[in-house]
Amino acid sequence: MRQSKEERVHRVFENISAHYDRMNSVISFRRHLKWRKDVMRRMNVQKGKKALDVCCGTADWTIALAEAVGPEGKVYGLDFSENMLKVGEQKVKARGLHNVKLIHGNAMQLPFPDNSFDYVTIGFGLRNVPDYMTVLKEMHRVTKPGGITVCLETSQPTLFGFRQLYYFYFRFIMPLFGKLLAKSYEEYSWLQESAREFPGRDELAEMFRAAGFVDVEVKPYTFGVAAMHLGYKR
């Protein structure tokens, strides 16, 4: 029987959870750390605020948000992979953070009331959900008026030559890294498929606006291999 996208993605992340952080650094040449640092600077997260990290995975961005809002703030991380959350829980505990709560849940149906969060983020997770627009609308719903929602995700390079090199790397080299370092060729083959099929920067910006966000900002990184989309809720 053919697996749904949701079932396949769940299996992928349950299987790669132990190697996910290491492989992220290898695949992106550690650029993802600089990308997220720049996004956090642009968000200008304030102390005492409330944040939600959707598709939080092993909780790296969740932890960054928790440190930014401080002990008087509160951060929730949500993911549908229990194994990824277990890794995240260990990292949260190791840092002694008491303002973080990790939740097993579905990004398509966020278990929070309307207008709950000052900041809502999703990092390298939107491409893996069954329906991009449903998740963007859910993120908009739970963002407070005046709040910020941010997506940091792989994107489609537009520079000729580099674009072809990027696709070659994602299609052939990245799964090979997965096989050599994480014994997970099939799983990392899925990651390149999802990245290749994900909307480009302009299309995703339009989806942000269609979901209800205003003053949408787009920032490409490293010749466009990744991009930040930031929107505000009226």
Curated annotation (Swiss-Prot):
Q: Which residues bind S-adenosyl-L-methionine?
A: T58, D79, N106, A107
Catalytic activity as recorded in UniProt: a 2-demethylmenaquinol + S-adenosyl-L-methionine = a menaquinol + S-adenosyl-L-homocysteine + H(+)
Top-level taxon of the source organism? Bacteria
Which InterPro entries does this UniProt record tie to the protein?
A: MenG_heptapren, SAM-dependent_MTases_sf, UbiE/COQ5_MeTrFase, UbiE/COQ5_MeTrFase_CS
Q: Does the keyword Oxidoreductase apply?
A: no
UniProt keyword S-adenosyl-L-methionine, yes or no: yes
Similarity-based family: Belongs to the class I-like SAM-binding methyltransferase superfamily. MenG/UbiE family.
The UniProt entry, under PANTHER family, shows: 2-METHOXY-6-POLYPRENYL-1,4-BENZOQUINOL METHYLASE, MITOCHONDRIAL (PTHR43591:SF24), METHYLTRANSFERASE (PTHR43591)
HAMAP family, per database record: MenG_UbiE_methyltr
Full protein name = Demethylmenaquinone methyltransferase
Question: Which species is listed as the source?
Answer: Geobacillus stearothermophilus (Bacillus stearothermophilus)
